[in-house]
A protein has these predicted regions:
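Conserved structural core of kinase catalytic domains
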Residues: 2-85
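Hydrophobic transmembrane alpha-helix bundles
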Residues: 33-42, 95-99, 190-200
Length: 209
């Protein structure tokens, strides 16, 4: 609910468990085989996107600014032409669908499962420019793996991801590119841009008893 002429957002208090917690309980109680099925069901729930909100991915200046903050994607930049170097090579490797809005932090730990349904509780990093859908799903799987890898029987990260080819292509070049994009995103969030972001959007907060 918006108040104060749209300057204040008030959210209801929600009770439940995160999807990560519920998946962790399944992993602990039933093992990795049951976990794979549960993860698939959770991914299908999160990424059930209406067809009209999907479109082909295309590289944009905004995409480069966020995901190439470290310059690791420069090797995919095309040679200079009379119109300037383009990113067709990068777009070819990342060829995928994208959504009209991409919540980069659509992680299992950011999905609260309540009696009334599942709610996204962290949407600070929602981008309105095209982002490869596979990369967003990759982050969901990778962050779950990193949290629970001690319970996954010694599986390597890519081995774990390889169990879900319907969400993330098991392609070494693509996965390496996703890793570079993740490092670029972290630099964008926590590097020099973080100070600017905080200064631009800093607001006073008040805790209500």
């Amino acid at each position: 609910e918006l108040q104060d002429e749209g300057m204040t957002a008030v959210f209801p208090y929600l009770e439940g468990k995160t999807r990560a917690e519920l998946l962790g309980e399944i992993l602990t109680a039933q093992g990795a085989d049951a976990e794979v099925s549960a993860i698939r069901a959770a991914m299908d729930e999160i990424y059930s996107i209406r067809p009209e909100e999907r479109k082909p991915f295309a590289v944009t200046p905004e995409f480069i600014k966020v995901f190439n903050a470290l310059g690791e994607l420069d090797s995919y930049r095309d040679k200079e032409t009379e119109n300037g170097g383009g990113w067709a090579s990068l777009g070819a490797v990342l060829a995928d669908e994208s959504c009209s809005a991409s919540n980069i932090d659509a992680l299992f730990e950011n999905m609260l499962v309540t009696a009334d349904g599942t709610y996204a509780i962290d949407y600070e990093w929602v981008f309105l420019f095209p982002v490869p859908a596979g990369f967003v799903k990759y982050r969901t799987l990778v962050y779950f793996y990193r949290r629970y890898k001690s319970l996954l029987g010694g599986q390597a990260e890519r081995e774990f991801i390889g169990q879900f080819p319907e969400y993330v292509k098991a392609d070494e070049k693509l996965l390496s590119l996703y890793e570079a994009m993740e490092r670029g995103f972290q630099e964008y969030v926590h590097g020099e841009n973080q100070r600017t972001y905080q200064e631009d959007y800093m607001v006073k907060t008040k805790t209500l008893a």
